[in-house]
Design a protein with these regions (language model features):
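Short, locally clustered residues in the helix-turn-helix/winged-helix DNA-binding domain
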Residues: 473-477, 519
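Linker/hinge segments immediately adjacent to helix-turn-helix/homeobox DNA-binding domains
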Residues: 346-353, 357-466, 473, 482, ...
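Alpha-helical repeat scaffolds
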Residues: 20, 52-60, 87-97, 127-137, ...
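Recognition helix of helix-turn-helix DNA-binding domains
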Residues: 470, 478-513
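Residue-level signature for tetratricopeptide repeat
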Residues: 23, 43, 78, 119, ...
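Alpha-solenoid helical repeat architecture
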Residues: 29-33, 64-73, 103-115, 142-157, ...
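Alpha-helical linker/edge segments of TPR/alpha-solenoid repeat scaffolds
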Residues: 46-55, 59-67, 118, 159-162, ...
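Inter-helical turn/loop elements of alpha-helical hairpins
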Residues: 1-107, 118-131, 162-173, 204-209, ...
């Protein structure tokens, strides 16, 4: 087919575009062509076309010494885009070394920090990733129209790290920082970054419905536009998954986790892969019947860590997975140990504090002093207040009503299903008084959750008391009967009575047989 037979689908488009170019040439409008050049670089970088990116970048590079250094910088960027992290780092190491003290070194450091921020993130090295990202943002070198996009994506990366770590203050800072970036050209990519950060802020605040809507929209737009590699919307897909979990849409959350897991393999993101593995275990650990499978998987992940020293940054994720399991089986000592060795991870510290609140209730005034600025804080505070019998039944119902109504507005279900059976029963009773389809559905889920939990302590014969279950847990340890008594603050004579009742109810003859039953019920 000849060129003359090809026509534009839009009347006058070809001639109009040609006229724009002719006018730019006539006016010697170099900025017009520079913006076209930059726009093409951006598109190639976001769509994972590293080789084409490098070729296009080289079209503006001369043979001067500075030009040759810039060529190497663009080569490093191209390797980042093509996910060859090792080669990218080797080029950057050489560039930094050879340009020390040179005028072009600040530009090299900007490129290096941008690349290393992304590489360190995907390798799970958050401290270095944050350091490099902030250094790149604060670089004295600016790159014209590319700069707002670079800054936006780096702030988005910082926000993602802080979301994973549950550092709410830093998430809010990112939400503020992104609004301070000027966008005179109306760059869509910067708008996407703003939306992504807003979805992460909403998720952290407990506004799950709004977070889901925004994050899902960003995922659809960016994946349709071919965003891949380090530019893939993994952060927003993570938000979508978290929201689905909080909605108690478990099958959908697991399905999306598998999608993100497959994408992480394609995009060579070790951290996202392990995050998906642990995310799946967290979801499965909500069901007592799956705890055996989850415990086995945790041990398999630990073995992988031991065999591969490069995975050391994933160790806290595996500890996190075990915390979910041990929380479900009420193994407080092990949870405290895991929390203690991950004291530098805000999310793990948060889990530890929450766990201690469940077992060592604060006084009423302390709970009333808790903040309620976000949806999550309001729900959590009123759930805790509803547990104080000293407030009286009417006041307890009022607290729970506030929590439930805010939960319906925010789409928060799972936070209620995590509560003790007494609170679940209160929700069931409340559903009979409030006219809400959402609450009716939550009530049915509460009934199912109580049934699941009860299977854990059904032994076939006469049921053990809660105190007897606590003693049974310790029988599989190396502690003597006297030591168990001291740990649980039980007198010697009372311990003898507990042991006698446990053996009788379980129809066993000795401590070893009782321990085997405890293990089969996943109490230890």
């Amino acid at each position: 087919m000849s060129n003359s037979s090809i026509q534009s689908p839009l009347p006058g488009f070809s001639s109009g575009a040609q006229k724009l170019i002719e006018n730019a040439i006539a006016k010697n409008d170099m900025e017009f062509f520079y913006k076209l050049y930059l726009a093409r670089l951006v598109e190639l970088s976001l769509t994972g076309k590293g080789k084409e990116f490098y070729q296009h970048a080289m079209s503006s590079i001369d043979d001067s010494p500075a030009g040759q250094i810039m060529a190497k910088g663009f080569e490093a960027l191209a390797n980042l885009i093509d996910l060859d992290f090792q080669k990218c780092v080797l080029i950057l190491d050489d560039l930094e070394k050879t340009t020390t003290g040179h005028e072009i070194n600040p530009w090299v450091l900007q490129i290096s920090n941008l690349c290393r921020a992304n590489i360190d993130f995907h390798n799970g090295n958050f401290d270095d990733s944050l350091q490099h990202a902030k250094a790149a943002i604060n670089s004295p070198i600016k790159s014209g129209s590319l700069d707002p996009i670079d800054q936006g994506r780096l702030i988005r990366l910082i926000c993602c790290i802080n979301l994973i770590l549950s550092d709410i203050d830093q998430i809010n800072k990112c939400a503020s920082d992104i609004l301070n970036i000027a966008n005179p050209d109306g760059l869509a990519e910067l708008n996407h970054a703003k939306s992504a950060i807003e979805s992460m802020r909403l998720l952290a605040s407990g506004d799950y419905r709004r977070a889901y809507e925004i994050a899902n929209s960003v995922v659809q737009i960016e994946e349709t536009e071919g965003r891949t590699g380090v530019s893939a919307p993994f952060d927003c897909r993570f938000v979508v998954i978290r929201c689905l979990y909080e909605f108690s849409l478990i099958s959908e959350a697991l399905e999306q986790l598998e999608v993100l897991r497959e994408q992480s393999i394609k995009n060579k993101s070790n951290f996202i892969f392990w995050l998906c593995e642990v995310g799946k275990l967290r979801i499965l650990s909500r069901n007592i019947n799956d705890l055996g499978q989850v415990s086995q998987k945790v041990e398999e992940l630990r073995e992988k860590l031991l065999l591969d020293p490069t995975l050391k940054n994933m160790a806290w994720l595996v500890d996190l997975a075990e915390i979910f399991v041990k929380n479900s089986t009420n193994e407080i000592a092990r949870v405290n140990s895991l929390v203690s060795r991950n004291h530098n991870i805000p999310y793990v510290k948060l889990l530890g504090r929450t766990r201690m609140k469940n077992f060592n209730f604060e006084d009423l005034n302390s709970v009333k002093a808790l903040p309620e600025a976000t949806s999550f804080e309001l729900i959590y505070k009123n759930i805790q207040l509803s547990k104080f019998k000293s407030e009286g039944g009417k006041k307890q119902r009022e607290y729970l009503t506030i929590a439930v109504q805010k939960g319906e507005e925010a789409g928060a279900r799972e936070i209620f299903l995590r509560q003790d059976n007494q609170t679940l029963e209160a929700i069931i009773n409340l559903s009979e008084k409030l006219n809400s389809q959402w609450l009716e559905s939550l009530s049915r889920s509460c009934i199912e959750r109580i049934k699941e939990r009860n299977t854990l302590v059904q032994f076939g014969g006469e049921q053990l008391t809660q105190r007897e279950i606590e003693v049974l847990k310790y029988l599989s340890t190396e502690k003597s009967v006297e030591q168990i008594g001291r740990t649980l603050h039980i007198s010697k004579n009372t311990m003898k009575t507990h042991l006698k009742n446990i053996y009788r109810k379980l129809e066993v003859q000795n401590r070893r047989e009782a321990s085997q039953i405890a293990k089969s019920k996943l109490l230890v």
